[in-house]
Swiss-Prot record:
Gene3D superfamilies attached to this UniProt entry: 3.40.50.12370
Protein name: Universal stress protein Rv2319c
One Pfam family named in its UniProt record: Usp
Species in which this protein is naturally found: Mycobacterium tuberculosis (strain ATCC 25618 / H37Rv)
InterPro entries for this protein: Universal_stress_UspA, USP_A, UspA
Amino acid sequence: MTIVVGYLAGKVGPSALHLAVRVARMHKTSLTVATIVRRHWPTPSLARVDAEYELWSEQLAAASAREAQRYLRRLADGIEVSYHHRAHRSVSAGLLDVVEELEAEVLVLGSFPSGRRARVLIGSTADRLLHSSPVPVAITPRRYRCYTDRLTRLSCGYSATSGSVDVVRRCGHLASRYGVPMRVITFAVRGRTMYPPEVGLHAEASVLEAWAAQARELLEKLRINGVVSEDVVLQVVTGNGWAQALDAADWQDGEILALGTSPFGDVARVFLGSWSGKIIRYSPVPVLVLPG
């Protein structure tokens, strides 16, 4: 068992490594830094190009390992770290090969640095992994920094659906395993076109508060039905849009937000709905996406 983090020199920065170290400490296991270099389609007549590509691939892998080692030297004290490099026609498939080969518990990804307003900008590789990974995927916001190397609290995103009750239970088991407190959080968000302008902001605010009140009742049922214990914090956060709502959630340094997903296909895989996707995009803390 190990934690796998995808890393390529100069691409996503050290945020993914910071998170990967914390996840490895949470699981009390080793860390594997995986560099996947895209392999082009074989062309027998271009032997010299193939040789140049192989050289470039080896140099990129070596540069990625050196860069990761520079960051991890001061971060990963007491953690066994190994480095894997392979060429693959698909970066996402290459990472999944490493995950399956090493029986990884979690796959850690970074966010593109140019996320504009969004804190997490998911590229095509991360998007495919979030929809196909057989293990939980942890993704970090761009330029994320944490001042503790431990997990301080696990928040569970609750969408008030029948499937999300099971997610709360799974998060409860994780919180117990990690030895940290748990919070169950849901969001009541005013959209841009919630109502036409003539309705007025007061009416919108009233409807939003009604939604929030209903969400509080649904959260309290989790406690009444024994899904969560008395020490679990239940919280509804409102906001004018997802960015404001996520900012208002009173995050702790060292906190992680866990989201559940729906099964997709014949086997358990991550399948993100719009609710989860918006939370991932604007979350100021790392997000742990659990397979369906």
